[in-house]
Amino acid sequence: MGANVSQLEREIGSDLFPPNEHYFGLVNFGNTCYSNSVLQALYFCKPFREKVLEYKAKNKRPKETLLSCLADLFYSIATQKKKVGSIAPKKFITRLRKEKEEFDNYMQQDAHEFLNFLINHINEIILAERNAGPSNGNPKATNQGGSTSAMASSIASKSSSTSNSNSNSNSTTNSNGNSSNSTGSLNANTSVLDASGSLTATTTPIISGNGTGTNGANSEPTWVHEIFQGILTSETRCLNCETVSSKDENFFDLQVDVDQNTSITHCLRCFSNTETLCSDNKFKCDNCCSYQEAQKRMRVKKLPMILALHLKRFKYMEQFNRHIKVSHRVVFPLELRLFNTSDDAVNPDRLYDLTAVVIHCGSGPNRGHYISIVKSHGLWLLFDDDMVDKIEASTIEDFYGLTSDIHKSSETGYILFYQSRDCA
């Protein structure tokens, strides 16, 4: 290797370095580690990267949006002449701060809130461009499922062939009705408790265009839906008449509370524990025409291509009058299969591989730092803003959390990205 070869290239080795792959860190603009860590995780989610590069290829001169800026950033990384380096996502950050004023400052931001905003906002952009149709001067942009252009094919294959890859806001919500008949906001909280009442789970809202409406172009799902959207089914059994009713709800990610010395598998099992509705929380049974005691459970009906799991690491403590970090040890396996699926689940045996983890480093939501680890071609890499390092798979255990309940600074998994093996 020549004198200009980076340390990372030396560690990987010229023979083992993935062809046409690029490992580029992202420059931090004062407080943008929250976005850098999420962007790296998304870049190494194969289906997402391919669709963003495909969008770039189809839209030659698009109006500047957050999606076009993201596409430019991904394209810049994917077409670098060097294999390793760093790049400044200035255009993307500038646009982000214009789009959402909460990010237009130098305060500590929450990585999950950013992910939530980004995914929903990209979806809205796609829907808006689809509704605009050929009149926007970009007729190809309306084709979500067609073949890519030659440019798209070359870029996407270049990356895909080498890509095997707060506060803990309660604003995350579910649909307040049968999602199969709604394209509006999803705004009814879902709360599923285990036997001790200590573990809950919620889902990230799908702001609009859930792909099941009847209003023209909005009736077709976008590629954001195809990648991230799953379906939960809420099953409620009246204890008086035994009638079972169900309601479907879409989600882009699942949020789970964390408990000490547990695992993601345990958290997801508890997510589907049966909850008894009684006393002031009785269920209104349509068959009985009255409020009755009932049993309710939540199960997964459709497993998404990319399963994003948010560990709710920040909790408000009255005695401290502030949010504190919950650094409990939660094991997240390299392989994951969901067992809390419904009887009519579309793909109940789907097997997932851990692709990326956004990690929070620090002692609370208003202080600390975000980094990410990603899997690429069998290699594990750590991205810390503009720095990129190769790590061993065993290092992942360092980010499970602490076995002690003492509140102190820690480096813990915060957002997990699991990619379905059938789309690898």
Swiss-Prot record:
Q: Which CDD domains match?
A: Peptidase_C19G
Q: Name one Pfam family in it.
A: UCH
Please provide, alphabetically and separated by semicolons, the GO molecular function terms listed in this UniProt record.
cysteine-type deubiquitinase activity; deubiquitinase activity
Segments carrying the region annotation (Disordered) are 131-189
- Point to the regions of Polar residues compositional bias: 133-144
Can you tell me which residues form the catalytic site?
C33 (nucleophile), H369 (proton acceptor)
| GO CC, one annotated term | peptidase complex
| All copies of domain USP, residue ranges | 24-421
Q: Which PROSITE patterns match?
A: USP_2, USP_3
Record EC number: 3.4.19.12
What phenotype has been reported when the gene encoding this protein is knocked out? Viable but sterile with reduced lifespan. Severe defects in adult intestinal epithelium; increased number of intestinal stem and progenitor cells in the adult midgut. Conditional RNAi-mediated knockdown in the central region of the notum results in notum malformation and disorganized thoracic bristle socket pattern with socket duplications or loss of bristles.
Q: Which reaction does it catalyse?
A: Thiol-dependent hydrolysis of ester, thioester, amide, peptide and isopeptide bonds formed by the C-terminal Gly of ubiquitin (a 76-residue protein attached to proteins as an intracellular targeting signal)
Q: Does the keyword Secreted apply?
A: no
- Which intervals of the chain form a coiled coil? none
What biological process terms from GO does the record include?
negative regulation of Notch signaling pathway; negative regulation of ubiquitin-dependent protein catabolic process; positive regulation of canonical Wnt signaling pathway; protein deubiquitination; proteolysis; regulation of protein stability
**Keywords, comma-separated and alphabetical:** Hydrolase, Protease
| Bias kind Low complexity: ranges | 145-189
Its job: Catalytic component of the Usp12-46 deubiquitylase complex. Deubiquitylates the wg/wingless-signaling receptor arr/arrow, which stabilizes the receptor and increases its concentration at the cell surface; this enhances the sensitivity of cells to wg/wingless-signal stimulation. This increases the amplitude and spatial range of the signaling response to the wg/wingless morphogen gradient, facilitating the precise, concentration-dependent regulation of its target genes.
PANTHER family referenced in this protein's UniProt entry, alphabetically: RE52890P (PTHR24006:SF733), UBIQUITIN CARBOXYL-TERMINAL HYDROLASE (PTHR24006)
Assembly information from the UniProt record? Catalytic component of the Usp12-46 deubiquitylase complex consisting of Usp12-46, Wdr20 and Uaf1. The Usp12-46 deubiquitylase complex associates with arr/arrow; the interaction leads to deubiquitination and stabilization of arr/arrow.
Per the record, the similarity remark reads: Belongs to the peptidase C19 family.
- What is the name listed in the Swiss-Prot or TrEMBL entry for this protein? Ubiquitin carboxyl-terminal hydrolase 12/46 homolog
Organism equals: Drosophila melanogaster
Gene behind the chain: Usp12-46
